[in-house]
Amino acid sequence: MLIDTHCHLDAAEFDVDRDHIALMAKQQGIDRIVIPSVERANFDTVIALCNRHQNCAYALGIHPMYVDAAVSQDIETLQNYIENFNPIAIGEIGLDYFLRTPKLNPEHIEKQVMFFTEQLKIAAHYDLPVLLHVRQAVDDVLKYLRRHPVRGGIAHAFNGSLQQAEKFIALGFKLGFGGAMTYSRALKIRDLAVKLPLDAIVLETDAPDMAPAWIGPGVRNSPLELLKIAQVLADLRQLNVTQVHAVTGCNALHALPKLA
């Protein structure tokens, strides 16, 4: 089973061919596509999209890069949506310390942390896994996961150290690998993709972002690229790609049981 565990198919970049892409993905052997929300404003959008396409499944959450526009009422709204719409996970949630601008000040970080921890509490209450955004914030994400334990999930677009990866695995998480792994210069990620146990890895595209090497930066990524991404992982690990499909698919179902 081949599963794209992280794809923003609702993004504006897909307005011209969204439904066609979802259909083509199914026809090309991509069994499931996980579509996380990023803010309250697109909860309904991802739900409607996944209702149109049975191979798509949605997660609901508030992304750390969208907390500036978020209000505390959004947390209550998220709870109401969980009770009424049964998402497969809470996500995309987490912390993002990448923005080296005045915006990344203590008050902004505090708001990120507040939304992250409140959503972890919701995930624990409803026994849902989480889809984590951890950009340049791996240690802090781990810290709050220890304070607010959840049933696991996926650390999306993982780019930490082997030791940090092992800490996520110990907490019940799988690690997402996608387009970044396809670049020959991405030595750390490629090394991780080989050294980690295969049963800790899931595949993703993060489309329309994180375009693989054969597309190049700045060009729209697509869930249709998952087949080649899987082949890259197979080549790095010197495995048959069929085995990569089977094991990473099983890993995704373990991390996100409602996908089954």
Stretch-by-stretch model annotation:
Residues 1-260:
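Mid-domain alpha/beta scaffold segments of enzyme catalytic cores
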